């Protein structure tokens, strides 16, 4: 009873009121039906604006798909791009779902140990891991579970390797708003030529404290999205409409609440960092 678990990525904040209120409003109006398989148009438009903040351009009509959380997004993408016998590079340690979802596709997992380099993958490591059977690499920056960000200069080198070998890059960016000490998130999809190879995966669980709302999204090229859409359409149909309305309002007007939570997380992180150092633990 005296042990505090830090093992689950679950914000201890309630979803900001502005988001809950928006969802309540639409439920009270009786808007409780299916949405388009793509997701609400207003949400996709807000997502496109959001991605533009990170120097990425995606059409809300054909290159952005709303999903039931990022976990569904990962599953749908892997089943769209992988064939039995393919290889996928997974940077470890990693989010617990990556490997099982890849294994369900009957592919070979190539494990990349990032602990040898400060818990982020390097371009040279990735280059060495690529074979003629490599179909994709799974990146997560900031990392779950380590929190480590891939430095922008290294990320640019990784982009070069990906373009050279023409493999897919699944970029899980669900923690991108929770960065500290003045750092800014950089998406691998923002580098020249990377839109053709990058599949951006993101959602609202972490930044907006919306884990139970199950709302995420995929952004990628139109050609690939046409295939991912089919899997989504016939498996989950759409994310809950009230979650979509809430997420759209979060993107429009919820950023001050996100910042309050981020500041609190940074204060907690600093406290843990100080305590670990005082105990002589490596940080």
Which role fits each region the language model picked out?
Residues 16, 197-283:
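PLP-dependent aminotransferase class I/II
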Residues 105, 164-165, 279:
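Helix C-cap/helix->beta junction micro-motif
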Residues 103-109:
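A short helix-loop-beta submotif of the ANL/AMP-binding
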Residues 114-181:
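Active-site phosphate-binding strand-loop segment of PLP-dependent enzymes
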Residues 80-102:
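Conserved PLP-anchoring active-site segment centered on the Schiff-base-forming lysine
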Residues 58-64, 84-87, 133, 195-198:
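Short acidic capping loops at alpha-helix termini that bridge into adjacent secondary structure
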Residues 1-69, 76, 250-253, 266, ...:
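N-terminal small-domain helix-loop-helix segment of the aminotransferase-like
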